[in-house]
Amino acid sequence: MSGERAKRFPLALEDLKREPRKPEGRAAERQAAGDAARQRLIAAAAAAPAAASPIAPERLAPRAAGASGSGVPVAKPARAKPPTTPGVAKSAPSSGVKNGDKSATPNVALSGALALTSERVRERMVERLRANGVADPRVLAAMSAVPRHMFVDPGLAAQAYEDAALPIGHQQTISKPSVVARMIELAAAGRTLERVLEIGTGCGYQAAVLSRVARDVYSIERVKPLYERAKLNLRPLRVPNIRLHYGDGRVGLPAAAPFDAIVIAAAGLDVPRALLEQLAIGGRLVAPVGEQAGEQVLTLVERVAPAQWRESRLDRVFFVPLKSGVI
């Protein structure tokens, strides 16, 4: 190019070449603007879910988001991540909470109802005892406090507060509530009992009642399964002043003597001499005496001197036999 031409045309032809047209034309710009508007709608929907349109956010995404040459990246709305343990997350509301409510709440209500019913029937039982002549308030309170249904088989629990002797296995029975209250009242005679011996633990019910009247209760059972059962029955009550022994009740417990009171829950032809000797001066022994097939009488024996006892024959009763040895 000559100097004159250069002055007239300062730019060369190659300088006038335009850059290649970018893919974004007017249509692309319009699409980008539309995408931005959609993003604003999505952001507004996320910020105010209660007022959001029922249209799913995915339907607001640009149709050509993945097309080549769009040039403007469009952020897709964030989706909630699935739980890491979907099985647990799905089952938790149904099996964890609902089943828990079904198993826990009714059981608590049922336990409360049973406890309330037990207390009410015990009170009615105590009223019957009072009407039949039991007057010692300590004995009545003890009979009211000890749950007799815990000492019988579940199938007999409905009869626990009836005035009836019930079988406890091994040809043994739990004495009638009226007999238990009568024997304990006779043994106490209004005194403060320090040490009491029971012959024939059985299921442990009478020992539990005695534990609320005396400071220390010693109880002997000759039938090993009943001895073990009594321990299990007494364990939930957490009675601290009962000492159970497996042995021959006719021998007594010389090591723990003398006793303020002795209660024998089985009938013999007479009262064993060993037990009379273990009774403290001024102490009282209550026992059924008589033949198994004949008449049995509830007998009170009082020790009035080292070698003198006074006997009183009271009520007709019926008990299982008093036997020697252990099984």
Curated annotation (Swiss-Prot):
Q: Where is the composition biased (Low complexity)?
A: 62-77
Keywords, A to Z, come to: Cytoplasm, Methyltransferase, S-adenosyl-L-methionine, Transferase
Q: Which family does it belong to?
A: Belongs to the methyltransferase superfamily. L-isoaspartyl/D-aspartyl protein methyltransferase family.
Xref: PROSITE patterns = PCMT
Source species, domain of life: Bacteria
One GO BP annotation here?
Answer: protein repair
Taxonomic path: Bacteria, Pseudomonadati, Pseudomonadota, Betaproteobacteria, Burkholderiales
Q: Name one Pfam family in it.
A: PCMT
Its annotated function is as follows: Catalyzes the methyl esterification of L-isoaspartyl residues in peptides and proteins that result from spontaneous decomposition of normal L-aspartyl and L-asparaginyl residues. It plays a role in the repair and/or degradation of damaged proteins.
Annotated Gene Ontology cellular component terms: cytoplasm
The protein, known as:
Protein-L-isoaspartate O-methyltransferase
Outline the segment boundaries, as ranges, of region: Disordered. Answer: 1-38, 62-105
Listed CDD domains: AdoMet_MTases
Q: Where is the composition biased (Polar residues)?
A: 92-105
Q: Which InterPro entries match?
A: PCMT, SAM-dependent_MTases_sf
Gene Ontology molecular function, alphabetical: protein-L-isoaspartate (D-aspartate) O-methyltransferase activity
* Compartments in which it is found: Cytoplasm
Recorded catalytic reaction(s): these are: [protein]-L-isoaspartate + S-adenosyl-L-methionine = [protein]-L-isoaspartate alpha-methyl ester + S-adenosyl-L-homocysteine
- The EC code for this enzyme is 2.1.1.77
Q: Which PANTHER family match?
A: PROTEIN-L-ISOASPARTATE O-METHYLTRANSFERASE, PROTEIN-L-ISOASPARTATE(D-ASPARTATE) O-METHYLTRANSFERASE
Basic and acidic residues compositional bias, start-end? 14-29
* Active-site residue numbers: 175
